[in-house]
Regions:
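Short, conserved beta-strand segments within well-ordered enzyme catalytic domains
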Residues: 1, 25-29
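Conserved FAD-binding subdomain of flavin-dependent enzymes
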Residues: 1-10
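Acyl-thioester C-C bond-transforming condensing/cleaving domain
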Residues: 9-20, 28-119
Length: 119
């Protein structure tokens, strides 16, 4: 989230400077995502049983959660999805975002990758 907001600040963009939020997209990739949630849930499962697993486990694991949260925070309403391409995920997101710009489907794309597979 901090990197996304910093990128927009560096580009001198925000929701008020983008004429059409439908033409403002976000593509952020993550290679693993949610690893801490998996570890925590495994511990809960083994010590407290399956009924104590959070109903929010799946949303914490899916690859597009970061993209969705950033899009909501910055007011982007255009293309919005997450990518998973192992170590190439960030570059893959940049390439896909470039296609939207080249095809004239979007005016602004916020793209990149993020990972912290440490717990």
């Amino acid at each position: 989230m901090a990197a996304a907001k910093s990128a927009l600040t560096d580009a001198k963009l925000d929701a008020s400077t983008i004429a059409d939020a439908q033409r403002f997209g976000v593509l952020i990739g993550s290679g693993v995502g949610g690893l801490e949630s998996v570890e925590r849930s495994c511990e809960i499962l083994s010590t407290k049983g399956p009924r104590k697993i959070s109903p929010f486990l799946l949303p914490a694991l899916i690859g597009n959660t970061a993209t969705a949260m950033v899009a909501i925070a910055v007011g982007a309403k255009g293309p919005n999805f997450g990518l998973v391409s192992a170590c190439a995920t960030g570059t893959h997101a940049l390439g896909e975002a470039l296609k939207y710009l080249q095809l004239g489907e979007c005016d602004v794309m916020l793209a990149g990758g993020s990972e912290a597979a440490i717990t």
